[in-house]
């Protein structure tokens, strides 16, 4: 709760605050309802919940939430490992989540994980991912995010997927990117996507995160590193970088270990040293 409250004062406009998953499956995500009941809710900040299935969606819509995210893996093997369903069954489950969210007047983002590669199957066909994306839009998804679950993406994969999406009729305004920094390609992938017109990116404060069902996965690109980069590229994020760094340091204090974010330690490019 302290971390979410800290983040909600930085200028971020969207925060994925909780996940409605089985506590016995991922203990760290337990207590979603209690968290939502306790956080501050400043104007202009949208709080969403990750849900794996219809049951999770039903629990989420009973709480004070602004939107849902549902994840479907492009890799059948990863889907079985992650949610114990085939990709086809997971797509059906996602359609149910979208319907539940819309019935509750909530927006729903569909996230396609392993969109750039799978730790079990290797390469993932971007045309397959684009076909899944079109199907999810047809089911009513309000936004699409494409997850680089184990940091396998490079600019070549990013361009290939965007080419496939555009060819399938998916506009970049419907696209968000979700990069992990496992192989230190997260930021260059963001620059590549920016150059193609993508303007929405997932990130995690301090670089927290990973996936228990994706061997070798590390956290998402650190939020403060992303904000620093895109501001230096001339984009106005509306986010207070100094406040974001304070949130990253708080996150590090809460988890009790060193986080991989760089800007939280070095500071902005033009921060000078007092002598």
Question: For the regions a protein language model found, what residue spans apply to each?
Answer:
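Catalytic cores and adjacent flexible loops of soluble metabolic enzymes
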Residues: 1-275
């Amino acid at each position: 709760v302290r971390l979410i409250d800290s983040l909600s004062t930085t200028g971020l406009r969207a925060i994925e605050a909780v996940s409605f998953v089985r506590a016995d499956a991922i203990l760290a995500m337990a207590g979603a309802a209690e968290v939502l009941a306790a956080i501050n809710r400043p104007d202009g900040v949208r709080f969403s919940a990750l849900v794996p299935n219809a049951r999770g969606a039903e629990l989420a819509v009973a709480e004070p939430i602004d939107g849902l995210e549902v994840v479907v893996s492009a890799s059948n093997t990863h889907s079985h490992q992650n949610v114990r369903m085939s990709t086809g069954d997971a797509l059906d489950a996602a359609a149910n989540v979208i319907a539940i969210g819309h019935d509750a007047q909530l927006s729903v983002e569909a996230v396609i994980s392993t969109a750039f590669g799978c730790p079990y199957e290797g390469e993932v066909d971007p045309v397959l991912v684009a076909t899944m994306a079109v199907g999810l839009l047809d089911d009513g998804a309000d936004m699409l995010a494409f997850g680089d679950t184990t940091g396998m993406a490079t600019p070549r994969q990013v361009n290939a997927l965007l080419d496939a999406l555009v060819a399938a009729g998916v506009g970049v305004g419907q696209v968000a990117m979700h990069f992990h920094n496992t192989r230190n390609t997260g930021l260059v992938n963001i620059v590549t996507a920016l150059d193609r017109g993508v303007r929405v990116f997932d990130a995690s404060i301090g670089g927290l995160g990973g996936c228990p069902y994706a061997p070798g996965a590390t956290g998402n690109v650190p939020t403060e590193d992303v904000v620093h980069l895109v501001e230096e590229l001339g984009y106005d994020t509306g986010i207070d970088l100094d406040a974001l760094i304070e949130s990253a340091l708080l996150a590090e204090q809460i988890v009790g270990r060193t986080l991989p974010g760089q800007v939280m330690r070095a500071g902005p490019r033009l921060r000078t040293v007092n002598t």
